[in-house]
Amino acid sequence: MGFIYARKLLLCMAVSIYAIGSTTTTETTTSSSSTSGSGQSTSSGTTNSSSSPTTSPPTTSSSPPTSTHTSSPSSTSTQSSSTAATSSSAPSTASSTTSIPTSTSTETTTTTPTASTTTPTTTTAAPTTAATTTAVTTAASTSAETTTATATATSTPTTTTPTSTTTTTATTTVPTTASTTTDTTTAATTTAATTTAATTTAATTTAATTTAATTTAATTTAATTTAATTTAATTTAATTSSATTAATTSSTTTAATTTAATTTAATTTAATTTAATTTAATTTAATTTAATTTAATTTAATTTAATTTAATTTAATTTAATTTAATTTGSPTSGSTSTTGASTSTPSASTATSATPTSTSTSAAATTSTPTPTSAATSAESTTEAPTSTPTTDTTTPSEATTATTSPESTTVSASTTSATTTAFTTESHTSPDSSTGSTSTAEPSSTFTLTPSTATPSTDQFTGSSASTESDSTDSSTVPTTGTESITESSSTTEASTNLGSSTYESTEALETPDGNTTSGNTTPSPSPRTPSFADTQQTPDNGVSTQHTTINDHTTANAQKHAGHHRGRAGGRRGSPQGGSHTTPHPDRLTPSPDDTYDDDTNHPNGRNNSIEIVPQLPPDRPIIELGVATLRKNFMEASCTVETNSGLAIFWKIGNASVDAFNRGTTHTRLMRNGVPVYALVSTLRVPWLNVIPLTKITCAACPTNLVAGDGVDLNSCTTKSTTIPCPGQQRTHIFFSAKGDRAVCITSELVSQPTITWSVGSDRLRNDGFSQTWYGIQPGVCGILRSEVRIHRTTWRFGSTSKDYLCEVSASDSKTSDYKVLPNAHSTSNFALVAATTLTVTILCLLCCLYCMLTRPRASVY
C-alpha cells in the first residue's frame, strides 16, 4: 500500500510538475519572443554570455537554484535567457535542496552584473531585443502570477539528472513550493525591474549611436553647406554680370551671346561640382567628410577672394585670368570664350582700370586665354564677316562695354559693303522656241555688271576684234568692269543658211545644250505662230557654249563642245546661266570679225531699273534694221522679254508695256554675232525682266530701236524708231482640273490661264448635263494671272441608294484657241461613308479592348509568397 500510495503521490507530483512546467513554458515562450535574436544556446554553460543581458532577470527571479539548471536543457530554444545565469547557478545545483533562498539572492546579484557586462557586446541585436523586450515586459508583469511556476525549474533537474534524489526532492517539494511562491513574487518584481533596465540601456545605446551618426552628418552638412553657400554667392554674382553682358551683346553680336552662355555654363559647372563633393562628403565617413569640408572651404575662400577683392587681387590668384578679366571688363560681351578662338591677334596685357568686382569675376571664369579683350572684340566682329576688320583696343572702364562692341561692328559692316560693291553679276542671254505654247522663251543676255548704280557718260570705243571685249581666262572667271560701266560680252551663235527671221516660232530639229544648260538650235524651219511672234533664232552663245558653226570655242575645246551635241533636244528656255556664264570672249582668227571702222559704246548698268538703259552703236544705216521681239512665260515670278536688233549702227533700245515706259526694268544690252546665210551679222540684244505682279497679261509690249541722234533728253519720238510689238501671253498654259468635295456632294471644275471666258460642258456618266445643271463663275484677268473659270455640279445621292456603285465626271472647257478637259471617277459615297464608319468603329473598339486589358493587368491581385 505504501508503495502504491507512493506511486500515486509521485504520479500526482509528476502531473503537478507537468502542469507547472507547461505554464512556465508558456511564460518562457512569451519571454523568448522578445529575446529571439539573442540566443541560440542549447547548453547552459556555453551560450550564457551571448544572451544573458536581456534574460538574466528571469533567471534571477527563479529563486530556487534548481530552476537555474532546469531552464537550461528544456527551454533552451524558447528561453535562452535563463541560460545566461546558468554559469553562476551551476554550483548552486548541489545545494538546491538545502539553501534555496540564499542561493537565489546570491545568484541574482551575480547574474545581474554579467548581464550588464554582456549588453554592450550585443551590437545591433541588443537594441532590437531590448525594444522588443519592452513590449514583452508588460506581458511578464501580467504573467507574474504565472511566474509562480518559477518552480518549473524544479521539474527540469529531474530531466537533467535522472539519478538525482528524486524522492528527496519530492518530499521537499511542498515546502519549496510554498517558499517559492513568496520568493517568486519578489522575483517577478525583480524581473520586471531588470528587464526595464536592460531595455533602457539598449535604447540609450541606440539613441547614442544614432545621435552620434546624426551629429556627424549634421556637422558635415553644416560645414559643407557653408562652403556651398559661399560658392553660390560668388556664382550668383558672376551670373548676374554675365546676364548684363548678354544684354549688351545681344544687340551687338550673336557670338557674344554665345560667349555669355558659355560663361554661365562654366560657372554653373563649378557650383555643381562643389555640390557633388558636398554630397559625397555627407555620405562618406566622418573622416572623409572632414577632408572634403576643408576642400570646400578652400574653394569658398578662393571664390570669395575673386568676388570681393578688386581686379588686382584676382590677378594674384591667376595671372592669365586676371589680365583677361581685367581687360574684359571694358567689353564683357565681345571677349568671352568663342571670340578668343577666332582671333589671337594683338594680345596685350593691358591692366584695366578699376572694374566692378562682379565683372572681373565673370570675365575670369569665362575667358581662359591670354588675349586681351581687344582681340576678343575684334573676333566677335570678325564672326560677322569681317576678315579684314581692324582690332580695336579697349582700355577703359566698365561702361565701355557698349562702346567697344559697337565701334568694331560698324567697321565690319562697312568692310562688307565695300567688298559687295566689287562683286560682279553675270547674266546670260538665251532664246529658245516653246512649241507647246506657241511662244518663245528666253533667258537673260550675257551681261556683266556691278551692283553700284551710277550715271556714267557713254563712251565711244573702237569695235575691233582685239579690243572689243576683255578676254577671259580658261577658268571662266568673270572680269569685273569698272564701277558704273557695263562690259560688252561678245559671243557667237550661228545657224544654217536656211534659217529665216520673222514672226514665227522656230521648231528645233537639232538642239545643242551648252554646259551651263542653255540651248542653241540649228537647222530650224519656220512654222506659223497662232498667237504671238517668237524670239529670233539669234541668241548669245556663252563662252562655254556650242554653236553649229565649226569654230574654236573659248574656254572649251571643240571636241568637248561637240560632245554635248545631239544629246538634248529643244528645251524651252533652258536654265538660267550658270555662275560661269557671262565670260567675255575674244574673237578668234577663224571667226568673222567686224571691220576696224565699226565702233560701239557701252551703256551704263541698271540692274535696279534706271531710265537710261541706252545701247549706242555708230550711225544708223539708211535702211531700217531688222528687229525681233519675244516674250518668255516659263518663269513663275517674272515675265522676261528679249529684243534682238540686227545692226552694226548706233542704236538706243527702249521698252514700253501698254503706254507706260518700263525701261527701269531693263536688264541691259549685249552685243552678239549671228551668221545669216554665211554672212556675219552683228546684233544688239536687250532684255527686259518685270515681276508678273506688275504686268497684266494680254497687254501689248513694244521694243523700239532708235537712232542715237534722235535721242534728246528724256523724250523720244518712237515714230522715228524701228519698233516691234507683241502681246504678253498668259503666265502659264491653260489647264483644267476636277475636284470633289470632302463630303462627296459636289464636283468642281477649275480652268485657269484663260484668255477669254470659255464654254464649259459637263458629262456625268453617259449623260450630258444641260446648262442649268451646273453653276459657273468667271474671274477676269488680273495682274500676273489670266482668267479663271470655276464650275460646280451638285452630286445627288438619291440615285445611289438603288445600287449605283460609281459615277464618272467629265469637264470640257473650250476657249477661242484651245480646249482642255479633265475626267475623274467618284466612288459610291455611301460605300465610302460606310467604310469610314466601319473603320472608325473598329478602331474605337480596339482601343477600348486594349484599355480594358491594361486595366485588368494592373488591378489583378498578385499571389503572395509565404
From Swiss-Prot:
Please give the superkingdom of this protein's source: Viruses
| Range of residues in the leader sequence | 1-25
Tell me which InterPro entries the record gives: Varicellovirus_Gp2_glycop
A Pfam family cross-referenced in the UniProt record is: Herpes_gp2
Residue spans with biased composition (Polar residues)?
A: 443-463, 535-561
Kindly list the places in or outside the cell where this protein is found, as annotated in its UniProt entry: Virion membrane
The membrane-topology field of this record reads: Single-pass membrane protein
Give residue spans, biased composition: Basic residues.
564-574
Keyword Glycoprotein assigned to the entry: answer is yes
- Residues bearing attached sugar chains per UniProt: N48, N518, N611, N659
Q: Where is this region: Disordered?
A: 24-185, 319-619
Q: What is this protein called?
A: Glycoprotein gp2
User: Which species is this UniProt entry from?
Assistant: Equine herpesvirus 1 (strain V592) (EHV-1)
